[in-house]
Every structure is written in structure tokens, then in C-alpha cells.
């Protein structure tokens, strides 16, 4: 049996041909054998198939003698938080995040919300599922519902000094995913005025898949910010593990520039800490971390790598330009809620707009943003690029793909971990024209 839904970091596939209730039950059985003793936390997103998949997963776990803690409709980060907070043996979030309508999936963790990836148990679970011919067993363990979010909400609010927050007007676009529920629970504790866009959870996604990176989805948030004179806007994907920012002019802020800002916000509270970042774009992050008295630590991109590096380095914060932000006190997990609270505090305390906070950084280190290339032969394409620039003798780093530093500009070129693509990022030291030239040059070389 081939099981294409098992990816490097999670399970994702079309329902029902690649992921269904029978497979979910068998995943529960296989997961039970992978974990230390203790209960398992389960939660699900707003997708229509998610509750049934979670129920089947629960049946498999309980038939294997595992007690289940059902936290219901939630965000991925809530499964991470509750797994750690309740000292559970593991947790599973049933979600397909921003994938197409007919998809669903699962994100799995063991104790302390440690990721279960291909090399830390996920492919072993896949192989067990493929070999499982037994029918459903009778549940021998219990399931309890635990939908109280108090501890999670208190933890989120602990990141900011509420007495310093100003009455900001914020556009919040949940994309009909789960983020709106948490915004509403936080709202009574905050002085903000919220302009709610596509706020109600709706697994039919009447306004499109909640992927804020799609141009049409960006436009909705940007327009709402401008029309309402908001201080800034925030948009989330369906399971709200990523959040995206728009300044008061409606301009989308590249995730890269948020990493440096959030690092400074965290380092102000935890001086001298280490900050883990990915190699795709680095100069701005390194400078802002060092200016704030922190220590930047380079790490391969991908949540499993970032979390592992943060643990080994005892880092206070980790940030990826892909809008994943990780916090030590949050079980080293990523959160889409903590970042906007920190940015709100930063804007309130500094008296500066988000646009003002990032403008100088964007001028100092302009970047291309990530550009994806579908190429027939990835190795040949990369070789063409490296051969072209060999005479310039760049400083090379292989932490994640190839990073080439030419002094006044640099690029990172890497294969996608999840798709058949080459991903390019270019940045310069304050030279927008050079950025344009080099980006076009490399793009032409990659296309052959």
C-alpha cells in the first residue's frame, strides 16, 4: 500500500482517496505504539471532514489503550500548548491549513510538543499503517473533552505589558479559519478596536481558502486597512500557525522584516538571548539581533530543524521569513497569536507606526522575496548559477541549499522540502538597482 499523504513534516492528502477515516483510525493505532506512556491531545480545524477524522483517530488511540483529551475546534498551536501544559504523551492537530478544499491532514507531536517528522517517527508510523490489516478494535481507554482555553489565553497575554498598550485599530482577517475565535476571547483583555474580516469559522470557505499569501486574499486585508484607517492589519491561515502583517497604507510586510522586529521585542524582555533564524535572508535579522544585544544562530529552514536548534541552544525566539515564529516559553513551538500581540506592544510603546518600524530596514536590506522556479533538472540549474558567479569568489554556506555572499549582495538557492521547486532569495546592502539586476540575472540562468 502506498500512502502519499505522509510527507516529510506532516500528513496531507486528498479526502477520501489519500486520507480517510479508516486511515485515521490506523494512524491512531500506530501513533500509540510510538509514544511514551500518557494521554494524547487531539484537536481539529474548521474543515468539514476534520471532526470525523479526529473521531476515527481517537478510536484508534483508545483501542490501543490510550486516553484521549479532546480540545475540539482549535488552532495548531493550541494542540502544541496543551500537549506541553497538560504533560501529555503527544498530540495531533487535524488540519490541512491553507491547502485546497478537498485536502485534509495531521500534524503530530510527542511529549513537550516535540515534532514527529519523517526521521523521528512519522515514516515508522506510515510503515505500520501500511502493514496494518486488523479491523477496528473496541476502545479500552477514555476520552475527555477539555475546551477550556484559559491557560492558553493567559499564556498569550503574558508576552505583553497590557498597561502600555494604546487603543489601536486593527484589521483582523481570519479567512473563515479558526483565528477569529481566539481574537474574540482576547479582545476583552485588550484596549484595541478590531475590524473583523471573514471572521466566522466556516469550513466551506465562502471567501476562498485561508491563505493570506494569495494576491486576491492580500487585497481584501489591504483594502480593509485603508478603508477603516487602521493602524495595521493581521491575516492568518486556516489553523493560524502563521500570521501576516499589513501596515497602515495596506502594504504587505515581507515576513523577513518581522523576524528582526520580533527578535528585538523578545530581547528587550530577555536580554542577551539567542535567536535562531533561517539562511534564506539573513543580514537584517543578524544586524537587529546584535543591535539588541542578542546572539544570532543560523539554522536550516523547517519547523523541526528550528525547534531542535532552539532547544539545543536554549534560544529565546526563532523566526523564519515564511511567517513561522517560535518562542521558548511556548514549548519552543510556533504561534500565530504571540507575534501580533508583540507588534501591537512595540507600536504602542515606541509611538511609531509599523510602516515606520520596517521602512528603514527595507531600505537598508532590500530583498526579492521568495521566488519559486519549476525546473526540469534542479542540479543542472544550480550548477549554471554557481558556474556563472564562480569568478567572483563568493563566500559559500551550505546550511540550507547554497548561500553565496558577494559582500554587497547575497543569494540563497534551495530545493523545496515539500514541492518539486527551486526557491530563490536575493538581498543587497541598500542597493535596489543591484537587487533587481541580480535577481533577473539568476532567474534567467535558472530558466536556462
Model-predicted segments: where are they?
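Short glycine-rich phosphate-binding loop at a beta-alpha junction
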Residues: 39-45, 169-171, 273-277, 316
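N-terminal small/polar loop signature for handling phosphorylated ligands or for N-terminal nucleophile
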Residues: 40-104, 186-246
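Phosphate-binding and adjacent anionic-ligand microenvironments
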Residues: 270-448
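Gly/Ser/Thr-enriched, mixed-charge loops and adjacent short helices
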Residues: 104-228
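Proline/glycine-rich low-complexity loops and linkers
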Residues: 78, 122-154, 158, 248-321, ...
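Glycine-rich phosphate-binding loop
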Residues: 88-103, 108, 225-247, 252, ...
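An N-terminal, well-structured beta->alpha segment
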Residues: 1-59, 63-65, 89, 145-168
Amino acid at each position: 500500500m502506498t500512502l502519499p499523504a505522509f510527507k516529510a513534516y506532516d500528513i496531507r492528502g486528498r479526502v477520501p482517496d489519500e486520507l480517510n477515516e479508516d486511515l485515521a483510525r490506523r494512524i491512531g493505532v500506530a501513533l500509540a505504539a510510538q509514544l511514551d506512556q500518557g494521554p494524547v491531545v487531539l484537536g481539529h480545524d474548521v474543515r468539514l471532514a476534520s471532526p470525523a477524522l479526529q473521531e476515527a483517530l481517537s478510536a484508534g488511540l483508545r483501542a490501543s489503550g490510550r486516553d484521549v483529551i479532546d480540545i475540539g475546534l482549535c488552532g495548531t498551536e493550541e494542540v502544541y500548548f496543551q500537549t506541553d501544559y497538560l504533560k501529555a504523551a503527544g498530540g495531533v492537530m487535524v488540519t490541512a491549513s491553507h491547502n485546497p478544499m478537498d485536502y485534509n491532514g495531521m500534524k503530530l507531536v510527542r511529549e513537550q510538543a516535540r515534532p514527529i517528522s519523517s526521521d523521528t517517527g512519522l515514516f515508522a508510523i506510515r510503515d505500520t499503517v501500511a502493514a496494518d490489516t486488523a479491523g477496528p478494535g473496541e476502545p479500552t481507554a477514555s476520552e475527555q473533552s477539555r475546551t477550556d482555553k484559559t491557560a492558553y489565553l493567559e499564556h498569550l497575554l503574558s508576552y505583553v505589558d497590557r498597561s502600555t498598550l494604546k487603543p489601536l485599530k486593527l484589521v483582523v482577517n481570519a479567512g473563515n479559519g479558526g483565528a477569529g475565535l481566539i481574537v474574540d476571547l482576547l479582545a476583552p483583555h485588550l484596549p484595541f478596536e478590531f475590524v473583523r474580516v471573514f471572521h466566522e469559522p466556516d469550513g466551506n470557505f465562502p471567501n476562498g481558502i485561508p491563505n493570506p499569501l494569495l494576491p486576491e486574499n492580500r487585497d481584501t486585508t489591504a483594502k480593509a486597512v485603508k478603508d477603516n484607517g487602521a493602524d495595521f492589519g493581521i491575516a492568518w491561515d486556516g489553523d493560524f500557525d502563521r500570521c501576516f502583517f499589513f501596515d497602515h497604507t495596506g502594504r504587505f510586510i515581507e515576513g523577513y522584516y518581522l523576524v528582526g522586529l520580533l527578535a528585538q521585542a523578545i530581547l528587550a524582555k530577555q536580554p542577551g538571548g539567542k535567536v535562531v533564524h533561517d539562511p534564506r535572508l539573513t543580514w537584517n535579522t543578524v544586524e537587529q539581533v546584535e543591535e539588541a544585544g542578542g546572539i544570532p544562530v543560523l539554522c536550516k529552514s523547517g519547523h523541526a530543524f528550528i525547534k531542535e536548534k532552539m532547544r539545543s541552544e536554549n534560544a529565546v525566539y526563532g523566526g523564519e521569513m515564511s511567517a513561522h515564529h517560535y518562542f521558548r516559553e511556548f514549548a519552543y513551538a510556533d504561534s500565530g497569536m504571540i507575534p501580533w500581540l508583540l507588534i501591537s506592544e512595540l507600536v504602542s510603546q515606541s509611538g511609531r507606526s509599523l510602516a515606520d518600524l520596517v521602512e528603514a530596514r527595507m531600505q537598508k536590506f532590500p530583498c526579492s522575496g521568495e521566488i519559486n522556479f519549476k525546473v526540469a533538472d534542479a542540479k543542472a540549474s544550480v550548477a549554471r548559477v554557481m558556474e556563472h558567479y564562480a569568478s567572483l569568489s563568493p563566500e559559500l554556506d551550505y546550511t540550507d541549499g547554497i548561500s553565496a555572499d558577494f559582500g554587497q549582495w547575497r543569494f540563497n538557492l534551495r530545493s523545496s522540502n515539500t514541492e518539486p521547486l527551486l526557491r530563490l532569495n536575493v538581498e543587497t546592502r541598500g542597493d535596489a538597482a543591484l537587487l533587481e539586476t541580480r535577481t533577473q540575472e539568476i532567474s534567467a540562468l535558472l530558466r536556462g
